[in-house]
């Protein structure tokens, strides 16, 4: 199994009802879809996110699974989840990786390309 056998799509959005701009608190959600395009199952073991705000402050988040799960994703299956990210600025980015183990026992990482977290009508 190769890393390109797992396709990861992330859709971010701004949550104005949970944000407090006057207190420098901007909350974003992101929806993640992981599609297994291979002929074998793989288990998502851990995640690593690199979160950068508009002032170039970087926070790294590492942990087991996602939203408390370590899903086994079968051939042709899709696993989806949503989570959130608070920032002190109205703009930022996220990128990272997921660590998997294929049913053959071979570990591999899937890179998640950088995506933008932005309050609507905010330019940086």
What positions do the PLM features span?
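Low-complexity, acidic Ser/Thr/Pro/Gly-rich terminal tails and inter-domain linkers that flank the onset
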Residues: 1-25
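Short beta-strand segments
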Residues: 6, 42, 59, 106-110
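Short, solvent-exposed loop/turn segments enriched in Ser/Thr/Gly
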Residues: 25-31
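Asparagine-centered strand-capping/turn motif at beta-strand->loop junctions
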Residues: 34-38
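Short acidic, flexible loop segments centered on an aromatic residue
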Residues: 40-59
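Short, surface-exposed linear segments at secondary-structure transitions and domain or protein termini
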Residues: 53-56, 68-78, 117-124
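Intrinsically disordered, low-complexity Pro/Gly/Ser/Thr-rich segments with frequent PxxP/GP/PP motifs
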Residues: 59-91
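Terminal connector regions
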Residues: 86-124
